[in-house]
Design a protein with these regions (language model features):
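Glycine-rich anion-binding loops and their surrounding alpha/beta cores
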Residues: 1-180
Length: 180
């Protein structure tokens, strides 16, 4: 949770086991009032609604997105619809995974252990599918930050960086520093 009031809501949300209005409010109540943000929403109508709310706020750029297959991340298997909010204006665009690679089902984990293994394989570059999944999402973040408007260029840079194992080396370095 970002907003202090959300800490009281979090346990109830978890007990309910289904999305509530607080799932939509969370990203909008960030007290850091970040100028750039990407917000994934698993429902297209809600994504468009959130984009309209964000357009009323004073943010440099926010991209709200939802995949047509119901994920709150850029999908590796279906079109992702994005609402690019800049200076109160909303521009809609789509990301088609087929423009980057042969589409494949979004990787998932069935346990914390599987998630940890997938994370490690991603950061050390040994699992091409999870690397592509993360790289495609990073490409959107890079676009939001203005690094490049070209998603393909951003994807290639992110994919190359993740595949290199540099992220894994950096994480090991931090872990070793914490243990010393």
């Amino acid at each position: 949770y970002f907003h202090p009031a959300m800490k009281n809501v979090a346990p109830v949300r978890k007990q309910l086991g289904f999305p509530t209005v607080f799932n939509m409010l969370g990203p909008l109540l960030n007290p850091a009032d970040v100028p750039y943000q990407i917000i994934g929403v698993p429902n297209l109508k809600k994504a468009e609604f959130i984009a309209k709310v964000v357009a009323l706020k004073d943010r440099k750029r926010v991209i709200v997105y939802s995949s047509k297959d119901g994920y709150d991340e850029v999908s590796t298997n279906d079109i992702t619809v994005c609402f690019d909010v800049k200076s109160g204006e909303i521009e809609k665009f789509e990301i088609n995974p087929a423009d980057f690679f042969e589409p494949f089902p979004v990787p998932s984990a069935n346990s914390p252990e599987e998630a940890e293994l997938a994370f490690m394989r991603t950061v050390n570059g040994s699992d091409p599918l999870t690397v592509k999944t993360v790289a495609l999402n990073v490409a959107l973040a890079m676009k939001c930050l203005g690094i490049s408007e070209n998603l393909k260029e951003n994807f290639e840079k992110a994919n190359e960086f993740l595949s290199s194992g540099k992220v894994y080396s950096f994480i090991k370095e931090i872990a070793n520093a914490d243990n010393s």
